[in-house]
Amino acid sequence: MNGKKLYISDVTLRDGMHAIRHQYSLDDVRAIATALDRAKVDSIEVAHGDGLQGSSFNYGFGAHTDLEWIEAAADAVSHAKIATLLLPGIGTIHDLKNAYDAGARIVRVATHCTEADVSRQHIEYARELGMDTVGFLMMSHMQTPEGLAQQAKLMESYGATCIYVVDSGGAMNMEDIRARFRTVKAVLKADTETGIHAHHNLSLGVANSIAAVEEGCDRIDASLAGMGAGAGNAPLEVFIAAADKLGWNHGTDLYALMDAADDLVRPLQDRPVRVDRETLALGYAGVYSSFLRHSEMAAARYGIKAVDILVELGKRRMVGGQEDMIVDVALDLLARR
């Protein structure tokens, strides 16, 4: 590590939206952002779980607009930068400008791991705005390390100054992570940073984040109490405790994060964010973690097991944005009975 300061990127107020169906109140956002800021995380990502303009029939309607959430968080911080997420095809460059005006200074432009070419316009515009511009390659387990590296190179060529390996399905192990970081870093410029976004569906969120750092990763996504889609993200307070024991420089207050996780975030969970039968199925089948709540709703409606829906989604290699197929899969399974 050579004393390198890790960049701690909190995603409680974006990925964590999935865990409560995008229903954070503005008071929740202010309280959580204030606690994270006092604990000295580097950035706080804020948006609907599916990014700017994700509030929709397909993904679920939010309790507030992205801009209301971003403004609430921006007003609460003095140290951390406010980040947001943009998926080309859901959010536009106009939405990005509005998010910037509301206080966002970092944007993660997210595409499926084979579709980096759709990010060009959004990355270039973010750079024009002067934003810290990140390329975010979702479902990275569905690409070979070599294929992922080429997609990373594309995002870098458009102007992204940091590229993320994103384990949206929580499906990778430590060797999968190591292989992707080695291959991606080998093709990027020396000054292009890398980041890890882990999910905890196989209980490997923290271990995978540690493996990434050992391969030279600069930025680590994590969330309080693991608040996120599926079994959640790498739990922030757990990663920080582990990093501390490894002697790594993270710059955050562990005990403040522990308090925020248990006092502010865990009480908001209407479904426990944990590894259980359904969330384990996500990781095992390599399914997009935010399919969890949608699949559980379909299972309840049609009287079938959520696990069966999730496994079938994995067999069909469904990816983020295909939430509408969950009901189709449920009906197909019902017809097979």
From Swiss-Prot:
Binding site for substrate: R14, D15, S168, H197, Y288
Site note Transition state stabilizer, residues: R14
Origin: domain of life: Bacteria
Reactions this protein catalyses: (S)-4-hydroxy-2-oxopentanoate = acetaldehyde + pyruvate
Active site, renumbered: H18 (proton acceptor)
Keywords: Aromatic hydrocarbons catabolism, Lyase, Manganese, Metal-binding
Binding residues annotated for Mn(2+), in chain numbering: D15, H197, H199
Signal peptide region: none
A Pfam family per the record: HMGL-like
Keyword Manganese applies: yes
GO molecular function, one term: manganese ion binding
Classification via InterPro entries: 2-IPM_HCS-like, 4OH_2_O-val_aldolase, Aldolase_TIM, DmpG_comm, DRE_TIM_HOA, PYR_CT
Span of domain Pyruvate carboxyltransferase: 6-258
Gene3D superfamilies the record matches: 1.10.8.60, Aldolase class I
Record-linked SUPFAM superfamilies: Aldolase, post-HMGL domain-like
Family designation: Belongs to the 4-hydroxy-2-oxovalerate aldolase family.
HAMAP family: HOA (MF_01656)
Name of the protein in its database record: 4-hydroxy-2-oxovalerate aldolase 1
